[in-house]
Amino acid sequence: MASPASANMNAVRETMDVLLEISRLLNTGLDMESLSICVRLCEQGINPEALSSVIKELRRASDSLKASENSTSQG
């Protein structure tokens, strides 16, 4: 028989697998590590909508920086 800690760990793993599948279906682009960080932040009281906005803004900034680097290296 599985210990309570082992059963809890299996439940956490299963929950994260389901969340990752939902994340993929929604095409969020989050990997397991990023999703895990987001879940932990939400569990600690961070507003999910604010977190989503920050992630989107960071992606925009990253894309803009990459585009800038590409145009600089090509010209």
Swiss-Prot record:
Its main location: cytoplasm. It is found in: Cytoplasm, Cytoskeleton, Microtubule organizing center, Centrosome; Cytoplasm, Cytoskeleton, Spindle. InterPro entries: MZT1. Disulfide bonds: none annotated. It comes from the Eukaryota. Keywords: Cytoplasm, Cytoskeleton. The keyword Cytoplasm applies. It holds the Pfam family MOZART1. GO terms for biological process: gamma-tubulin complex localization; microtubule nucleation by interphase microtubule organizing center; mitotic spindle assembly. One of its GO terms (cellular component) is cytoplasm. Belongs to the MOZART1 family. Part of the gamma-tubulin complex. This is Mitotic-spindle organizing protein 1. It comes from Danio rerio.
